Amino acid sequence: MTDSTRSLRNCLAPAKLNLFLHITGRRPNGYHDLQSVFQLLNWGDTLHFTRRDDGRVARVTDVPGVPEESDLVVRAANLLKAHTDTAHGVDIEIDKILPMGAGLGGGSSDAATTLLALNRLWQLDLPRAELQSLAVKLGADVPFFIFGKNAFAEGIGEELAEVELPTRWFLVVTPRVHVPTAEIFSDELLTRDTKPVTIADFLAQQTSDAEWPDSFGRNDMQEVVTRKYAEVAQVVKWLYDVTPARMTGSGASVFAAFHSKHEAEAAKAKLPASWNGAVAESLNEHPLFAFAS
């Protein structure tokens, strides 16, 4: 990352994985209570920010299928600008590599990186808690990326507690299908009454010799998604022939863990050509963590 008084270049917006995802209830307002562990990855979109003195917020790169006015990156910048009444503006460039509708948190991570980067570039010095309260307005996953550590999540995903996770290499496989999150959450067959677990339950599994991630929990959305989307079911089956695997978020991406980069790359080399595969190492901390206190 390059840092100057007028620009911030090469700011990573890391992907996340849901190591498990349990839905424990549904609220009267339609939101779902969940439990999950969010894992940061050293892989994601890259954003570049150049300060403007005319107060305008502009996305200067095209993102296919995402109009500028509805882009979470632009919305995040405008939200922060309105909250602080700063006179500054910004040009935002996005090198987009994370697939959309994949359960990797791409748009949410882009928004969080924008809030963190502009907190530094605009010299706002807002505390992390204040940025997290703004982030909730942009989406349920955005506060996690501001939190900036691997986390045990509860509530709708906004109640976060840091967890220490071992270093792992992951193969993340995404078929060419977009899975709308709202469609999966509204499915009548979705499990919504999984028994709550504790952080201690999860951490005890981390030191066991059982196969991982099969050794703890599940993704309650996976059964619904694989029933609706044959492409996702095919990825799960293919990966299971290699090693235990699990869908992240509401899909469509599926991940498997490996002890080394070499093992993950070897599995990736065998993927069908129609699937997008990426090898990524786990992260313990968001790359822009120091941009808020």
Curated annotation (Swiss-Prot):
Enzyme class, broadest EC rank: transferase
EC number of the protein: 2.7.1.148
Coiled-coil ranges (or none): none
Active site: K16, D141
Binding site for ATP: P99, M100, G101, A102, G103, L104, G105, G106, G107, S108, S109
Alphabetized GO MF terms: 4-(cytidine 5'-diphospho)-2-C-methyl-D-erythritol kinase activity; ATP binding
Pathway the protein acts in: Isoprenoid biosynthesis; isopentenyl diphosphate biosynthesis via DXP pathway; isopentenyl diphosphate from 1-deoxy-D-xylulose 5-phosphate: step 3/6
Annotated keywords: ATP-binding, Isoprene biosynthesis, Kinase, Nucleotide-binding, Transferase
Catalytic activity: 4-CDP-2-C-methyl-D-erythritol + ATP = 4-CDP-2-C-methyl-D-erythritol 2-phosphate + ADP + H(+)
InterPro entries: GHMP_kinase_C_dom, GHMP_kinase_C_sf, GHMP_kinase_N_dom, IspE, Ribosomal_Su5_D2-typ_SF, Ribsml_uS5_D2-typ_fold_subgr
Record carries keyword Kinase: yes
UniProt GO BP: isopentenyl diphosphate biosynthetic process, methylerythritol 4-phosphate pathway; terpenoid biosynthetic process
Family from the record: Belongs to the GHMP kinase family. IspE subfamily.
Family annotation (PANTHER family): 4-DIPHOSPHOCYTIDYL-2-C-METHYL-D-ERYTHRITOL KINASE, CHLOROPLASTIC
Function: Catalyzes the phosphorylation of the position 2 hydroxy group of 4-diphosphocytidyl-2C-methyl-D-erythritol.
Name of protein: 4-diphosphocytidyl-2-C-methyl-D-erythritol kinase
Species: Burkholderia cenocepacia (strain HI2424)
Gene name for this UniProt entry: ispE
